[in-house]
């Protein structure tokens, strides 16, 4: 099984890759920013011997096609990616609205378009309870449109990000 992950260097992503690598037939391709390349060796050490089944792909989810070349797209295309898992996001409540929109909204649009371009199998999004805004009480999956008080940029961008995936995937 082949996986493509955004956010693999983050808290959840590092642990998810570890779990996926416990599956003997798994290969994990992960998007990494160029400035994060020094982190690759640390990740490989964390993942141990199974790290030889991981493949860093330098790119940027804020760019169309994730900033990948035609050659990279061709290499990943054709159903070789069974699961695309989108974890990457700005989760800093103090980050500017502009950067949150760029990463959380436009980044998600770009990842969805990328998944379509490479003919990925299943698309998985790790969202946030913030997508509910300040809704009081129990908020179920089927209540997405009932989110309230999305004025805070993080809440709004996570809500819009999840909406993109709900509509397009």
Enumerate the language-model features and the residues they cover.
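NAD(P)H-binding glycine-rich loop region in Rossmannoid oxidoreductase-like domains
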Residues: 50, 54, 58-106, 118
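Active-site Tyr-X1-5-Lys
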Residues: 149-169
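Short, well-ordered alpha-helices that flank and scaffold nucleotide-derived cofactor binding pockets
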Residues: 18-22, 113-116, 167
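Conserved Rossmann-fold NAD(P)-dependent oxidoreductase catalytic core, especially the SDR/UDP-sugar
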Residues: 86, 94, 98-99, 106-156
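Glycine-rich phosphate-binding loop and adjoining beta1-alpha1-beta2 segment
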Residues: 27-67
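N-terminal Rossmann NAD(P)H-binding glycine-rich loop of SDR-like oxidoreductase domains
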Residues: 1-25
